[in-house]
Structure formats: C-alpha cells, structure tokens
Amino acid sequence: MKPTAIFLMGPTASGKTDLAIQLRSSLPVEVISVDSALIYKGMDIGTAKPSKEELALAPHRLIDILDPSESYSAMNFRDDALREMADITAQGKIPLLVGGTMLYYKALIEGLSPLPSADENIRAELEQKAAQQGWAALHTELAKIDPISAARINPSDSQRINRALEVFYITGKSLTELTEEKGEALPYDFVQFAIAPQDRHVLHERIEQRFHKMIELGFQAEVEKLYARGDLNINLPSIRCVGYRQMWEYLQGDYDHEEMIFRGICATRQLAKRQLTWLRGWKTPIQWLDSLQPQQAKETVLRHLDSYQKG
C-alpha cells in the first residue's frame, strides 16, 4: 500500500498558507513548499514568504534553499520533494505539499523525461547567432521547431530560448516532446485540493492590496539590495519572478514608480489566471475549496481525508 500525501494547490494570494497552518494543528502533517519563488534566500517580501510566526506554527521545507544567482528546475524540485516526502513518511507523518507552481506538481505526479546536460559549444554558437541576428530571430526559429514552447517563452527571454534550442540541437527532439515523455510515476496515493475565492473579483482585490502592502513593508529596499550585488540580472529565474521583474525594471529607469506598481499588480493577476487555467485543465480529480470560507475549507479537507483513508 502506498503512503498518503496531500496536495494543497491554488493561485497566488488565495489563502494556501493560512489553511496549511490550520491543517497542521489538526493533522499529523509536515509542510513542503511547492513554489518556484520561495526557494530563494533574501527574497521574502515580494514572494509573500510565510512570516517567522507562520513558520513557527508550520515549518515549510524547500524554502530558502538557493541563492538568487542559482537556477532550479522541475526535475530538481521532484528529486528534493521526493526526498523530503520520504523523510516525513518515515516519521509516520503525512506530507502536505502547498504552493502554486503547477509545473512542479505535474513533474512530481507524472515524472519527467531526463533532459540533456548543457552543451557549452552549442550555447556559444547560439549566443553568437543571437549577437548577429537578435534573440527575436532565434525565437522565430524556435517557433518553427517547437511552437508550444515558443508560445510560452517571451521573445526577449534569452536564457529560455537558448535552452529550448540547445535541447533540440542535442537530441533532435523539441523540449515539448521530451517533457511529454513520462518518467517515473509518484510512489504515493495523493489527495488533491485547490483553494481560491469563488468570486474572482475578490482574488483581484487581494492581489492589489497585497502588492501595496509589500511596498509598505520595504519591497523596494529588498530588490535594491539584490540589484546592488552586481552579479544578478533580469534574465535569471529569480529576478523574473512576478513583482521582482517590475521592480528591477523600475530601478533600471525603465518606468516610474506608479507604472511599476501597476505592472506588478497586472503581472500578478496574470500569474493567478495562468494558475487557475492549469487547475481547471488538471487531469486528476481536485476537490475545490472556497478561501472565503476558511473554517468550511478546513472541515472539507479533514472530512475528505478521513473518508479517503477509510477507503
């Protein structure tokens, strides 16, 4: 019999952390973060990282594990998450995976086809080609090879364009083809929940209020500290995180403070929309929870889990 795991998914600002804390007070669970922004040290305000008080109530694994100069893949996450899940299960507890990075959940459930290691010669050739023709031209080339990846990648995102083309040149297969090849399935029985306000206008308001709150808490100073390091740039996954990119561009002088706030809020709302689109198209059953009814949401999880474990 496989051990049990709980997935608590949802868009940004939906109340996942609050519910996770409530569940930890009632269930023998340990929390694993499923968030591609919370992995970075020194990025606390703009990622809405759980506070010290919240972490005292519900410690989160897989947060603050990398410097912002480092990259982290879905495969890295799968390896790390499986290790943490095994540790939690060995303690007789249930892994509670909480977050909104849907690609990480997908990788965990379905496994991943191993991607080739970087080839410095191919990368150098692509960078030389980009210097002559521009990254937009390479993005056009990618669109012919792998239209699905090209649609997801911004024409100015040199790092991701380079990687997608590099994978094709090494393997002869597109990144989309390779990522659709299944790897090892998750060795757990898992129950999936998604939390969001039933009224989407509430989510939009929460996102706007939270972004303004981040500004009040010192988000600009947090990014200024990263900006001053000198070894970070806007093409790194950490700086491309929602909010950080907009603040970074503001610090570069690309637009004024008011425009930065507007763009940051818009980008966060777009992220929430993408997350909800992922969830609506999810292949396996999800129990939806209304974050405007937190007590009811908690009771639904407890009731559902109890009936699930009884079979």
Curated annotation (Swiss-Prot):
Designated name of the protein: tRNA dimethylallyltransferase
Protein family: Belongs to the IPP transferase family.
Site residues, Interaction with substrate tRNA: T101, R123
PANTHER family (UniProt xref): TRNA DIMETHYLALLYLTRANSFERASE (PTHR11088:SF60)
Keyword Transferase: yes
Entry-linked InterPro entries: Dimethylallyltransferase, IPT, P-loop_NTPase
Keywords: ATP-binding, Magnesium, Nucleotide-binding, Transferase, tRNA processing
Residues binding ATP, per UniProt: G10, P11, T12, A13, S14, G15, K16, T17
Protein purpose: Catalyzes the transfer of a dimethylallyl group onto the adenine at position 37 in tRNAs that read codons beginning with uridine, leading to the formation of N6-(dimethylallyl)adenosine (i(6)A).
Catalysed transformations (reactions): adenosine(37) in tRNA + dimethylallyl diphosphate = N(6)-dimethylallyladenosine(37) in tRNA + diphosphate
GO terms under biological process: tRNA modification
An example Gene Ontology molecular-function term: tRNA dimethylallyltransferase activity
Chain residues that bind substrate: T12, A13, S14, G15, K16, T17
Subunit structure comment from the entry: Monomer.
HAMAP family: IPP_trans (MF_00185)
Cofactor: Mg(2+)
Annotated segments matching region Interaction with substrate tRNA: 35-38, 159-163, 240-245
This enzyme's EC code(s): 2.5.1.75
